[in-house]
Amino acid sequence: MSPQTETKASVGFKAGVKEYKLTYYTPEYETKDTDILAAFRVTPQPGVPPEEAGAAVAAESSTGTWTTVWTDGLTSLDRYKGRCYHIEPVPGEETQFIAYVAYPLDLFEEGSVTNMFTSIVGNVFGFKALAALRLEDLRIPPAYTKTFQGPPHGIQVERDKLNKYGRPLLGCTIKPKLGLSAKNYGRAVYECLRGGLDFTKDDENVNSQPFMRWRDRFLFCAEAIYKSQAETGEIKGHYLNATAGTCEEMIKRAVFARELGVRIVMHDYLTGGFTANTSLAHYCRDNGLLLHIHRAMHAVIDRQKNHGMHFRVLAKALRLSGGDHIHAGTVVGKLEGDRESTLGFVDLLRDDYVEKDRSRGIFFTQDWVSLPGVLPVASGGIHVWHMPALTEIFGDDSVLQFGGGTLGHPWGNAPGAVANRVALEACVQARNEGRDLAIEGNEIIREACKWSPELAAACEVWKEIRFNFPTIDKLDGQA
């Protein structure tokens, strides 16, 4: 045994197991501006004190393990360990607590969402001492944010590229999502864009299947884009899904899209992975492509209130990793989404500085230090009667995306697009004239029906459609 080993082994090391809270629960700790801060909803197993549970989360997501180890003496735990610095009860929940954990910045690789999540939401979520664990929010410090490129272009650059201002953008997901040939798919794209939409979209699971290979789809969609642009005089786009089985194949598809001269590609960022997403975002910035992000698989992670991760964390991660659009729920459509919580993470996507606001689920003040913003996309079970509410909720910097609400029009795809464009223009004009969309929305739509038979037909078809189911993931304190 070397003298150095003898010295280290003899200075204060004692083998065995000790409580996590003795090392990792530090209520006296004052957080630093460079710390990554996390708010965890912790449900300890019966008999496990909240302080021990919170300390266990801090330990197992940073430097700790289940027993003391000799090599702790070879580093500075005080410099590198995570710290549970505050615990508070959850209103109305006797067995749940919010544990606040601070992580030193040196624990994380620069510019890597993958590495950040591997620590913070890694093995600790399977820890036996916890009945359930959910990451509610993260504070990303400016020092770490500055190591990321973020969205390829951002909101203002996108508007300049499209020459579209003063209103939400309109989109449509082509349906049926699977089974169409590339030529019929391109036809639907053309009809929707010609009818007045700004964008059409590949559904998230359209990649390169036997019925429609990706290269054929890209070619027919590009033809549809150029034809509709020539006929309308407007700039158009189609989200060509570049998601693939390998990063190399994904980039190959993005390269082909750029060669066709289209303006935007798409990625499924959770199923594709953050490493792939960041790589694609870098390619898109370097080559002038906008990047639309779909959040397929998010509800597996974020829907249950006591375990997993809230979507506001996934939204922050996407802004770091890179994307110009991301699906963010609708509040009024068929998919899960509490209004105040949704508005909270919509602001976190778009704004440069967002204050702590627990009434909207925002646990920490977030300074994005001029990282470009992301357009929230409202999509899922929406139609023309929802247009006033969507315009009022999401504002101008958003994409309102009607799939069935366009293609389900009784007269066809182009009239469906016309109906949505007329409804949107009517709502924007009414808002600009000072009318209250929340109160007068239905009246505004009825007035517009008088001079748009396409809108009148759409209103008749969907007048009884409602998705009145309670939200599962409500903010704390809501009934």
UniProtKB/Swiss-Prot annotation:
Where along the sequence does the record put site: Transition state stabilizer? K334
Key word Endoplasmic reticulum present: no
Task: Check the record and name the PROSITE patterns matching this protein.
Answer: RUBISCO_LARGE (PS00157)
Q: Where does this protein reside within or beyond the cell?
A: Plastid, Chloroplast
The record's Pfam families line, in alphabetical order, gives:
RuBisCO_large, RuBisCO_large_N
Relay the cofactor remark from the entry: Binds 1 Mg(2+) ion per subunit.
Q: Which PANTHER family match?
A: RIBULOSE BISPHOSPHATE CARBOXYLASE, RIBULOSE BISPHOSPHATE CARBOXYLASE LARGE CHAIN
Major subcellular site: plastid
Q: Name one GO biological process term.
A: photorespiration
Instruction: Report what the protein is called.
Output: Ribulose bisphosphate carboxylase large chain
Protein EC: 4.1.1.39
Q: Where does Mg(2+) bind?
A: K201, D203, E204
Additional detail: The basic functional RuBisCO is composed of a large chain homodimer in a 'head-to-tail' conformation. In form I RuBisCO this homodimer is arranged in a barrel-like tetramer with the small subunits forming a tetrameric 'cap' on each end of the 'barrel'.
Does this entry carry the keyword Disulfide bond? yes
Please report the organism this UniProt entry assigns to the protein: Barbarea verna (Land cress)
Q: So which cofactors does this thing need?
A: Mg(2+)
